[in-house]
C-alpha cells in the first residue's frame, strides 16, 4: 500500500496546481435500482473533527460506480464502528447483505491510520469479507479511501475497482491570456491540476498505459503538432508537426508505439511511431480519410474511423498489413472509437436521424446498444475496468462531461463552473 502511494506521488507531486472550480459527479439516473449496501460513518478517535469523512468517500465511490446504492445514514438501523458491533439481522431486514465499518485515528508522527472491515450480513452473518488498514499523511486520505473502495468493490462484484484512476480533459475558459487548459483530476473531479496552459487550442489528450505521460495536440506553433508530456517532470517531446493536420494520438497497450493521424499527403491517414526508435510507419493509404485510432489489446490491430465507404464508419486493420475490415453497419455514421481493455466491445459516437449518441458494439456479435440520450455526444473514453464511460456533450451554450455505465443503466454528469470541458480521457489503473 505504501509503495503504491509512493509511485503515484512521484507522478503527481511536480504538477502545477491551480485553484479552479472543480467538477463534481451529479447522478442523474440509475442509482435507485442498484444493490443496497451499508457504509457507516468511520469513527474518528482524535480531537475535533475528522480531517476527511472517509466513510462518505467510500459511499460516494460505490454509488458512483452505478452498482451500489448506499443506504442513507438516517435509515441505518445502527451505526457500528467495528465488526463485533454489527447486528447482521438488523441490516438484512432492510435487504442489505453487506456493511462497511471503519475507523480513523491520528498517529504520533502526524499521520493517520485508517482501517475498515466489510461485513457479511446475510449469507454468512458476521463474517469479515475484506479488511485492510493504511497509514497515510493528510494529503493521501482520499487516496486511502479510494483504495478501500476498490477493495470492497472487487470483493462484492469480482471486478477490479477503478476509484484510484484519473481523468484528463481540455477546459476552455472565457478570456485570459491562456484560455485553453489541459487538466487532470481524480475520477470524481477532486484534486484537479493544470498540466498545460495555452493561448491556442489543445485537443485529444491520451494516457500512456503506465499513467506517467499524456499525448495531446497543440496549436502553439501556429499549426497542429503532436506532443508527449511527462507528468512528473513536465518534459515535452514533440512527436509530429507535419504540414496540415497532426492529431488523434493513441498509445499502444504495451506503451511501445503511438498511433496518430496525419494529412501531410492530402487525405487523413493513420501512422504509427515506434517510441523507442522514433521511426514512423504509414498504416493506411488512399484518398479516403482515416483517423481516430484505438488499439486492440494485441498491440497489432487498430480500430479507426474511415469514410472509404462514403460516410464515416468504424474499421479495423492490422498495422503489419492486410485489407481493412468494416465493423459498423447500423446507423448513418459511427466514429470516435474507444476499444475496451479486454477487446470485447467498442464505444463510439453513433449518428442516426440527426441524433448523435454514445453507443456500444459487441465486437464478437456485432450487437449495438445506444447508451445515452444527451445532446451532441462526443469522444467516449472507457474506464480501465470496462464498467463506465466518460464523454462530452452539449448542454445549453457549452459542453460538459457526462458518465454512463456500459450497460446504459446508470448516468451522471460532471459539470464545471469555469469553462467548457471537452476531450475527456480516462486514465489506466494508477
UniProtKB/Swiss-Prot annotation:
Main location: periplasm
Any Pfam family: TolB_N
Signal peptide: 1-21
GO biological process, alphabetically ordered: cell division; protein import
Gene Ontology cellular-component annotations: periplasmic space
Keywords annotated in UniProt: Cell cycle, Cell division, Periplasm, Signal
Organism superkingdom: Bacteria
Subcellular location: Periplasm
Keyword Glycoprotein: no
InterPro entries: 6-blade_b-propeller_TolB-like (IPR011042), PD40 (IPR011659), Tol-Pal_TolB (IPR014167), TolB_N (IPR007195)
NCBIfam families associated with the record: propeller_TolB (TIGR02800)
Function comment: Part of the Tol-Pal system, which plays a role in outer membrane invagination during cell division and is important for maintaining outer membrane integrity. TolB occupies a key intermediary position in the Tol-Pal system because it communicates directly with both membrane-embedded components, Pal in the outer membrane and TolA in the inner membrane.
Family annotation (HAMAP family): TolB
The protein's assembly and partners: The Tol-Pal system is composed of five core proteins: the inner membrane proteins TolA, TolQ and TolR, the periplasmic protein TolB and the outer membrane protein Pal. They form a network linking the inner and outer membranes and the peptidoglycan layer.
Family recorded in the similarity comment: Belongs to the TolB family.
Protein name, per record: Tol-Pal system protein TolB
Native species: Photorhabdus laumondii subsp. laumondii (strain DSM 15139 / CIP 105565 / TT01) (Photorhabdus luminescens subsp. laumondii)
Lineage: Bacteria, Pseudomonadati, Pseudomonadota, Gammaproteobacteria, Enterobacterales
Amino acid at each position: 500500500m505504501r509503495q503504491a502511494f509512493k509511485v503515484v506521488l512521484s507522478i503527481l507531486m511536480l504538477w502545477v496546481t491551480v485553484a479552479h472550480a472543480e467538477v463534481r459527479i451529479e447522478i442523474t439516473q440509475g442509482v435507485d435500482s442498484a444493490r443496497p449496501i451499508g457504509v457507516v460513518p468511520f469513527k474518528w478517535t482524535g480531537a475535533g473533527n475528522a480531517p476527511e469523512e472517509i466513510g462518505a468517500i467510500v459511499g460516494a465511490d460505490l454509488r458512483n460506480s452505478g452498482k451500489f446504492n448506499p443506504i442513507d445514514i438516517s435509515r441505518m438501523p445502527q451505526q457500528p464502528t467495528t465488526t463485533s458491533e454489527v447486528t447482521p439481522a438488523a441490516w438484512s431486514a432492510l435487504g442489505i447483505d453487506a456493511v462497511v465499518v471503519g475507523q480513523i485515528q491520528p498517529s504520533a508522527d502526524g499521520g493517520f491510520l485508517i482501517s475498515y472491515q466489510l461485513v457479511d450480513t446475510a449469507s454468512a452473518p458476521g463474517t469479515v469479507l475484506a479488511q485492510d488498514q493504511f497509514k497515510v499523511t493528510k494529503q493521501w486520505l482520499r487516496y486511502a479511501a479510494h483504495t478501500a473502495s476498490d477493495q470492497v468493490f472487487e470483493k462484492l462484484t469480482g471486478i477490479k475497482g477503478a476509484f484510484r484512476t484519473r481523468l484528463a480533459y481540455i477546459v476552455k475558459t472565457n478570456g485570459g491570456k491562456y484560455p485553453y487548459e489541459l487538466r487532470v483530476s481524480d475520477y470524481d473531479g477532486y484534486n484537479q491540476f493544470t498540466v498545460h496552459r495555452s493561448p491556442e487550442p489543445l485537443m485529444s489528450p491520451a494516457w500512456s498505459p503506465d499513467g506517467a505521460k499524456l499525448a495531446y495536440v497543440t496549436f502553439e506553433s501556429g499549426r497542429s503538432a503532436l506532443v508527449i508530456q511527462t507528468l512528473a517532470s513536465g518534459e515535452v517531446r514533440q512527436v509530429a508537426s507535419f504540414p496540415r493536420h497532426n492529431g488523434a494520438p493513441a498509445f499502444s497497450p504495451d506503451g511501445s508505439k503511438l498511433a496518430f493521424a496525419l494529412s501531410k499527403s492530402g487525405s487523413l491517414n493513420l501512422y504509427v511511431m515506434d517510441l523507442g526508435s522514433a521511426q514512423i510507419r504509414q498504416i493506411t493509404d488512399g484518398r479516403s480519410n482515416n483517423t481516430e485510432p484505438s488499439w486492440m489489446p494485441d498491440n497489432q490491430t487498430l480500430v479507426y474511423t474511415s469514410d472509404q465507404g462514403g460516410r464515416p464508419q468504424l474499421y479495423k486493420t492490422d498495422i503489419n498489413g492486410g485489407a481493412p475490415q468494416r465493423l459498423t453497419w447500423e446507423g448513418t455514421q459511427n466514429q470516435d472509437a474507444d476499444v475496451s481493455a479486454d477487446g470485447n466491445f467498442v464505444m463510439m459516437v453513433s449518428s442516426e436521424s440527426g441524433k448523435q449518441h454514445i453507443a456500444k458494439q459487441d465486437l464478437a456479435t456485432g450487437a449495438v446498444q445506444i447508451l445515452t440520450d444527451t445532446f451532441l455526444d462526443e469522444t467516449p473514453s472507457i474506464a480501465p475496468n470496462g464498467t463506465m464511460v466518460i464523454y462530452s456533450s452539449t448542454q445549453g451554450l457549452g459542453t460538459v462531461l457526462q458518465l454512463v455505465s456500459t450497460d446504459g443503466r446508470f448516468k451522471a454528469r460532471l459539470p464545471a463552473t469555469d469553462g467548457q470541458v471537452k476531450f475527456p480521457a480516462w486514465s489506466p489503473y494508477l
